[in-house]
Amino acid sequence: MERPRGAADGLLRWPLGLLLLLQLLPPAAVGQDRLDAPPPPAPPLLRWAGPVGVSWGLRAAAPGGPVPRAGRWRRGAPAEDQDCGRLPDFIAKLTNNTHQHVFDDLSGSVSLSWVGDSTGVILVLTTFQVPLVIVSFGQSKLYRSEDYGKNFKDITNLINNTFIRTEFGMAIGPENSGKVILTAEVSGGSRGGRVFRSSDFAKNFVQTDLPFHPLTQMMYSPQNSDYLLALSTENGLWVSKNFGEKWEEIHKAVCLAKWGPNNIIFFTTHVNGSCKADLGALELWRTSDLGKTFKTIGVKIYSFGLGGRFLFASVMADKDTTRRIHVSTDQGDTWSMAQLPSVGQEQFYSILAANDDMVFMHVDEPGDTGFGTIFTSDDRGIVYSKSLDRHLYTTTGGETDFTNVTSLRGVYITSTLSEDNSIQSMITFDQGGRWEHLQKPENSKCDATAKNKNECSLHIHASYSISQKLNVPMAPLSEPNAVGIVIAHGSVGDAISVMVPDVYISDDGGYSWAKMLEGPHYYTILDSGGIIVAIEHSNRPINVIKFSTDEGQCWQSYVFSQEPVYFTGLASEPGARSMNISIWGFTESFLTRQWVSYTIDFKDILERNCEENDYTTWLAHSTDPGDYKDGCILGYKEQFLRLRKSSVCQNGRDYVVAKQPSICPCSLEDFLCDFGYFRPENASECVEQPELKGHELEFCLYGKEEHLTTNGYRKIPGDRCQGGMNPAREVKDLKKKCTSNFLNPKKQNSKSSSVPIILAIVGLMLVTVVAGVLIVKKYVCGGRFLVHRYSVLQQHAEADGVEALDTASHAKSGYHDDSDEDLLE
């Protein structure tokens, strides 16, 4: 990967304990767009799709606080008045449900994946590798559990004791297909690669020799797990229709490929040299029949990706080194130019989040600044409004703290870079309409970064802090079925501090916070929020876990092992419905180290199933109970049935969040600022951008030039409000034609037939006509981005798929996207 720019180089200065971003002098690197949106949060009734796993190296945990103390205690300022009494007989109950497994294994790393949802099947792959002068020696072991990690069986013989390539991971099939693919190491002279396939939840494996050497992990079609996609080391695109038993190369010179809806495949191809050499001159193709026929849907492509129902492409502008985002909602048959600033060679785009209603887009600022601007789209993904200035995003390949709080709709948390280079956290409760600082926790004091010791706010540590090697073991955590709960490391002051953080919890989706635990911890949520488990982050061996049955108000300590272990990971089944937690680590003696896991089942702590009177009604987003609009966000309010903190009972695996929505009348809070307007900080009204005053707002929409008359507001995509305020907004057709030529697909290709000559002649005539129109209209509509004049393109260009537009990926566990820079190297 290319060398990160600016702040991503990791050089920091720390005056007054602030986390600051240092400006660097070396020239900036070329930007890489990141156009793949992170996958949406899981639905209330989890249907896990795709590999979800954890991977740890053989190492001790990073330095942390003291060894956890035993006993019970209460955090400050609890939300309910209660004593932290000791749970009856909890030590005996947990002791009877603690299962140790010692692995007779000296491997240097462990990878863990769940196979299916609620199946109890876990695969563990250990690897040991010693690099020699020319070749490397290694071995792998594969273990399987079918009781959530309480017991493991060595099944290495099922893969013929073959060394498995860990860079490909364990490719787990979608839904509960039970499919698993492991990619094996082969000798240098082999004609192709080798995989081991299982379709029965890893009970059996079949060895398959490939006619190619894979470059990437096998990609399952979301609609049919028998359909697989793979890129070869020679840039060939290969497809299998029978779960990898047989393969067919459907195209050569492919740079990037992705599955779209309905088994559509989108891919970019180079025509002159290589993927890197042709970056910005790639072609985007689509096949809807697994490679029988093809259609070129875009040219001059820099990168592309998928998010929600949108297909995005980063496209080079004519006679320029800038590029623009184009959007399609019909798999690339027609395209529209997004009303966003163009970016130069050293900048990037990044899709932070996308769903069927809207897109969060980060646009990098010119220069080596380490920040950019967040824009939010309309429901077409075309017209964008400025949402947040100075958004921290260090570089292509760098990190952003942008976090979707999945436990409450409309809530996102991220970081901004202040003028003094300090980093501050911001939160939005209305999907980017307004951002504000996080409230100071009631049971916390302002730290040394605060100018006023009585006025400060909470600042959240996320991906950027982790990338800078601060003492932050985990990113913020929330789960869709644990309504309102958010857990995160943070500091309380005027900006993020480099001092040792504490752990904070919110039970209302981020409106209010309380210190939950002192010092850094690992944490996870079980039983849809019924239990929270934590382990202190320490460089010493540990044997104590903490758990809470009342959303972090009171904590119990449990010694899970007489012999402390070097802790490496805390694992629970994705979806937060499980009652089991696995603690992974290793023990070491003078000459040896051994992997060990402890799986603890909390089923006897929550002995009874929850009943109706264990739940209480809770109005989400409630800030002013006396106001009839209280709780109205995005046009409606929601009342939830939530577990009482005092109830010690089990929600169960089949728990479904119960909620009752009701429509609200429209108010200013239901509107974003329209194109050309913005909301000043801490203001509710939109004001016109100074540089736009007196200018006519004209744009090109689907080939027609139109005039926009607006009072500065447009409804938030997905907002359901009815009646009430309705700011005037009118789009008038000026009866003038316009076009844009950034995307210009020239041909439709088929394996079975060539394009007739007569169609080529007709196409040439059409191109000539279009070129004439473009010359006439070049400065009227389209072309380079203007602040007060914007252009929308309709052309037969690209297909659905926006992954990895310009920026770097977030996380590497299946919840974030790959970047072009990763795939082009």
UniProtKB/Swiss-Prot annotation:
MF annotations from Gene Ontology: enzyme binding; G protein-coupled neurotensin receptor activity; nerve growth factor binding; nerve growth factor receptor activity; neurotensin receptor activity, non-G protein-coupled; retromer complex binding
Propeptide: 32-73
Cellular component GO terms held in the UniProt record: cell surface; cerebellar climbing fiber to Purkinje cell synapse; clathrin-coated pit; clathrin-coated vesicle; cytoplasmic vesicle; cytoplasmic vesicle membrane; cytosol; dendrite
Motif Endocytosis signal boundaries: 785-790
Region of interest (Intrachain binding of the propeptide and the extracellular domain), residue spans: 48-59
Bilayer topology: Single-pass type I membrane protein
Gene3D superfamilies, per database record: 2.10.70.80, 3.30.60.270, YVTN repeat-like/Quinoprotein amine dehydrogenase (2.130.10.10)
GO biological process: D-glucose import; endocytosis; endosome to lysosome transport; endosome transport via multivesicular body sorting pathway; extrinsic apoptotic signaling pathway via death domain receptors; G protein-coupled receptor signaling pathway; Golgi to endosome transport; Golgi to lysosome transport
Pfam families attached to this UniProt entry: Sortilin-Vps10, Sortilin_C
Domain of life (superkingdom): Eukaryota
Lipid-carrying residues in chain (S-palmitoyl cysteine): 781
InterPro entries, per database record: Sortilin_C, Sortilin_N, VPS10, VPS10-sortilin, WD40/YVTN_repeat-like_dom_sf
Record topological domains on the Cytoplasmic side: 776-825
Chain ranges on the Extracellular side, renumbered to this chain: 74-754
SUPFAM superfamilies: Oligoxyloglucan reducing end-specific cellobiohydrolase (SSF110296)
Subunit details: Interacts with LPL and SLC2A4. Interacts with the cytosolic adapter proteins GGA1 and GGA2. Interacts with numerous ligands including the receptor-associated protein LRPAP1/RAP, GM2A and NTS. Forms a complex with NGFR which binds specifically to the precursor forms of NGFB (proNGFB) and BDNF (proBDNF). Interacts with the Trk receptors NTRK1, NTRK2 and NTRK3; may regulate their anterograde axonal transport and signaling. Interacts with CLN5. Interacts with PSAP.
Name of the protein described by the UniProt record: Sortilin
Organism: Rattus norvegicus (Rat)
